Amino acid sequence: MPPKGWRKDSEGNYPNTSYIKEQEKISIDDLLFPKSIITSLAKESLQNAFQKGEEERRITVSKDAALAMQRSATVFVNHLLMFARMNAKDSNRKSCNDQDIMAALDTLGLGALESILTGKMQEYQEAILWKKQNKVNNAVPGADGDIAMEDDEDDEDDDGREGADADAEPKSRADTEVQQGNAENDKLDGPPVNQEQVPSTRQNDLDLSTKKQKTE
């Protein structure tokens, strides 16, 4: 049994839920576009109407003018959408595309707006493509030249290593000569030769030679 308060229709049947929803009153206030967007679009169109070189003027839109544009824009778009849906239905499609909108403009006698609408659509698609490319570039590491910087750093590291190897070559040669001298002294059961002691041994030889000359 339906809830209390529901009445039968003219045929004597209780209304179902879908029937009640269809009977609900929908006013234009429920379909209005945001007033801020409509006002900003109106100001932008007025700014573009000014000639180049003129000073920018501050444009103000009154409350009544904003309400009138809001209502008229809502009525126009819904009226245009009705004809676009009819074209889509004739083509056995459930959704409308841009071609349906263009055909609806021709039906309403507003074919002159097709070129303007086409240009705006191209600008919108280019803006979307530009945003996608920026997202891809920001997501890929090294897309802004980081790879080149890393290559430069690697080259600098290689140059530094080569310089360090070149400086180490003379030291390694001196060390090998000292080690060879120590090995020969070890064979003769003598003390190991140190590089720092080389000048002192030469001085001792000179002292011995002078002593021999004096004794003679």
From Swiss-Prot:
GO biological process assignments = DNA damage response; heterochromatin formation; leading strand elongation
Asked if the record carries the keyword Repressor, the reply is no
Compositional bias per record (Acidic residues), positions renumbered to this chain: 147-160
Question: InterPro entries per the record?
Answer: DNA_Pol-Epsilon_Subunit (IPR051377), Histone-fold (IPR009072)
| Acetylation as UniProt keyword | no
Q: What is its main location?
A: nucleus
Bias type Polar residues, positions: 194-203
Q: Which GO terms describe its molecular function?
A: chromatin DNA binding; protein heterodimerization activity
Q: Which residues form the signal peptide?
A: none
Record keywords, A-Z: DNA replication, Nucleus
Misc remark? In eukaryotes there are five DNA polymerases: alpha, beta, gamma, delta, and epsilon which are responsible for different reactions of DNA synthesis.
Q: What is this protein called?
A: DNA polymerase epsilon subunit D
Species per Swiss-Prot/TrEMBL record: Kluyveromyces lactis (strain ATCC 8585 / CBS 2359 / DSM 70799 / NBRC 1267 / NRRL Y-1140 / WM37) (Yeast)
Q: Which gene encodes it?
A: DPB4
